[in-house]
Amino acid sequence: MTSILQVALLALIFVSFALVVGVPVVFATPNGWTDNKGAVFSGLSLWLLLVFVVGILNSFVV
């Protein structure tokens, strides 16, 4: 169970880093928001899902 938590946490860290770098780039490019709105919302949905998964898995490990 601990290794599953570690993998989920690592995925959360990678998605967070990608969003921290990617979202400002999307807003800085011309027509970036209209062209990449779906990708940003998909990334945010994945991030929110991973936050809940890590929280639930953490309750089983601790």
Curated annotation (Swiss-Prot):
It is found in: Plastid, Chloroplast thylakoid membrane. Its main location: plastid. The chain crosses the membrane at residues 8-28, 41-61. Induction: Transcribed as a monocistronic and dicistronic transcript (with downstream psbM). Disruption phenotype: Not essential, grows like wild-type at 25 and 17 degrees Celsius and from 20-200 umol photons/m(2)/s. Loss of PSII-light harvesting supercomplexes. Loss of PSII-light harvesting supercomplexes without a decrease of major antenna proteins, at 17 degrees Celsius and 100 umol photons/m(2)/s loss of minor antenna chlorophyll a-b binding proteins CP26 (Lhcb5), decreased levels of CP29 (Lhcb4), less extreme pheotype at 25 degrees Celsius and the same light. Altered phosphorylation state of PSII and LHCII, impaired non-photochemical energy quenching. It is a multi-pass membrane protein. The keyword Kinase does not apply. One of its GO terms (biological process) is photosynthesis. Signal peptide: none annotated. Keywords: Chloroplast, Membrane, Photosynthesis, Photosystem II, Plastid, Reaction center, Thylakoid, Transmembrane, Transmembrane helix. SUPFAM superfamilies: PsbZ-like. Belongs to the PsbZ family. PSII is composed of 1 copy each of membrane proteins PsbA, PsbB, PsbC, PsbD, PsbE, PsbF, PsbH, PsbI, PsbJ, PsbK, PsbL, PsbM, PsbT, PsbY, PsbZ, Psb30/Ycf12, at least 3 peripheral proteins of the oxygen-evolving complex and a large number of cofactors. It forms dimeric complexes. This is Photosystem II reaction center protein Z. It comes from Chlamydomonas reinhardtii (Chlamydomonas smithii). The gene is psbZ.
